[in-house]
């Protein structure tokens, strides 16, 4: 969705999730069956693609931009299932770092060619999480009967794009000294989707930590070494 065609991919996914949730709710009402929990995916885009002094928590409302509205609609459809008396958990996921695909694949390209540099201003925050941690959080949400409502799934601490890109270069043993890659280049390549890399909010994971979750990869260096180094 992040790097697909927003005019079709995201809209199709939006409708698909809402329609699927509606079908699930209708079927549950028809059969009278009630699962022990309903776990739904959302994103930190719920808070909007902004860089500011604010640190967002689960109590903050949705942004009015495109992605914020998409996330709001996803969550609304999930809570309609929760209205049936089913424990409902919403996982607001940050940028998932994984070995292949996704945002990290785009981020490492400059470093691979020895031209590591920030993307755009470099001041934008990156609310990230390692793939292993997000999977573990979903498992916890299924098993932990005390969990309900929204949870931010982002690694502890806050890092901006310049810091993350420099860490990528260091982990890969590449230089990091080139001027920032201009924002307009990403806008030319990805259009509106470029906001995923060029903007970002600080998002607090304190609620999931208070629930008892301990991050396997709490800092970008350990996460990137796991993902980018040969084992």
Predicted feature locations:
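Mid/C-terminal beta-alpha module of Rossmann-like enzyme folds, strongest
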Residues: 144-192, 225-231
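Catalytic helix-loop patch of NAD(P)-dependent Rossmann-fold dehydrogenases
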Residues: 15, 51-90
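Glycine-rich "substrate-gating" loop/helix at the edge of Rossmann-like oxidoreductase active sites
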Residues: 62-67, 94-101, 121-131
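Conserved Rossmann-fold NAD(P)-dependent oxidoreductase catalytic core, especially the SDR/UDP-sugar
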Residues: 21-65
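Glycine/proline-rich active-site loop of Rossmann-fold NAD(P)-dependent oxidoreductases
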Residues: 72, 84-86, 97-106, 141-151
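C-terminal amphipathic/interface module of NAD(P)-dependent oxidoreductases
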Residues: 195-231
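Alpha-helical substrate-binding/gating segment
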Residues: 108-116, 124-158
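Single conserved hydrophobic/aromatic residue that forms the stacking wall/gate
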Residues: 1-11
